[in-house]
Amino acid sequence: MICIIMGSESDLKIAEKAVNILKEFGVEFEVRVASAHRTPELVEEIVKNSKADVFIAIAGLAAHLPGVVASLTTKPVIAVPVDAKLDGLDALLSSVQMPPGIPVATVGIDRGENAAILALEILALKDENIAKKLIEYREKMKKKVYASDEKVKEMFK
């Protein structure tokens, strides 16, 4: 089970990238909105009551949500910094500069799909079915690149 928490509804497009991957893999998930700054009590309630094995925290600007989530659990937390201002660098730096002992894994700016894949890789450590699906997913990606290569080679003959 994966819990996706976004700092605001404006992060929905990023969350949808993660949700699409999780649906493709048939993994149980929940999606919530809670602000580290405006509703810290809701963040705590969600984290404390969630059955999630992994959390994905999506936030822009000051992006304290991933760190707050990490402070409330010993389960893995994956940050997705959002390009809201400053090309997302403010959110990226907020996510990667965590104090010792409170780690947050961080994927690229706006990369909800990579957060989902990383969460699945964590679950795959104990779930062979997910591990097999990840291998198949990578093979599919590989085939697309080979097909693109063939197409482009033909274009420039």
Swiss-Prot record:
Pathway participation = Purine metabolism; IMP biosynthesis via de novo pathway; 5-amino-1-(5-phospho-D-ribosyl)imidazole-4-carboxylate from 5-amino-1-(5-phospho-D-ribosyl)imidazole (N5-CAIR route): step 2/2
**UniProt superkingdom:** Archaea
UniProt keyword Magnesium present: no
Coiled-coil annotation reads none
Which reaction is this enzyme known to catalyze?
A: 5-carboxyamino-1-(5-phospho-D-ribosyl)imidazole + H(+) = 5-amino-1-(5-phospho-D-ribosyl)imidazole-4-carboxylate
The protein's UniProt keywords, in alphabetical order, are: Isomerase, Purine biosynthesis
Q: Name one GO molecular function term.
A: 5-(carboxyamino)imidazole ribonucleotide mutase activity
Q: Which family does it belong to?
A: Belongs to the AIR carboxylase family. Class I subfamily.
Q: Outline what the protein does.
A: Catalyzes the conversion of N5-carboxyaminoimidazole ribonucleotide (N5-CAIR) to 4-carboxy-5-aminoimidazole ribonucleotide (CAIR).
Protein name stated in the entry: N5-carboxyaminoimidazole ribonucleotide mutase
Q: Which organism does this sequence originate in?
A: Methanocaldococcus jannaschii (strain ATCC 43067 / DSM 2661 / JAL-1 / JCM 10045 / NBRC 100440) (Methanococcus jannaschii)
